[in-house]
Amino acid sequence: LLASKLHNQGYVFENRRFKLFTFSRILEKGIKHSKSELLFKRSISFYFSSAIDDIVCDLGEGCFKGMEFNLSGQKVFVSRIEVLTLPAFEEKILIRMLAPLTIYSTFEDGNGNKKTHYYAPGEINFSELLEKNAIKKFSTIQADLNYDNLQLSVKPIKVSPERNLQVVRFKNTTIQGWTGIYELFGSRELITVTYEA
């Protein structure tokens, strides 16, 4: 029930939908089998994280109830789930992005066509848009708390287009995101929600 709500609806704040979870790419390196397929020798693993405890619990319970599921036409068996302790966040931390960080804005060009601009780390508005996104996510989770004094900035520490620019196609849309190492500075609440979701 929770999984279908997340997939179909998400959590809503100011008419914007948020999934409030994230997951890494598969950590093991696969062997390229075709243009769209990778082969993995044995097991695969990945990280899953959410700012909502019920989402994590629902995923864990679902995996144990159905230890087998379908992934791109292949049967996959769950052998182990490990719960990791959340780090103790300070107001300045270094973080390695295991899932690409995607920052974008949508606008209309002179002909009325919808355009999307994906921002690169260090580009103007990158840090500001990340902060706005984190505030909206935090407000979705903690609607009763005041977020006027919360702030967050991001600084790329070890990021290069050759190694860290990730481009994927999803539902006929090209999406750009960035992995790499970043410094997050600001309110612990926003650092936490950025880390978890």
Question: What are the language-model segments listed below?
Answer:
Residues 1-197:
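RNA-interacting cores
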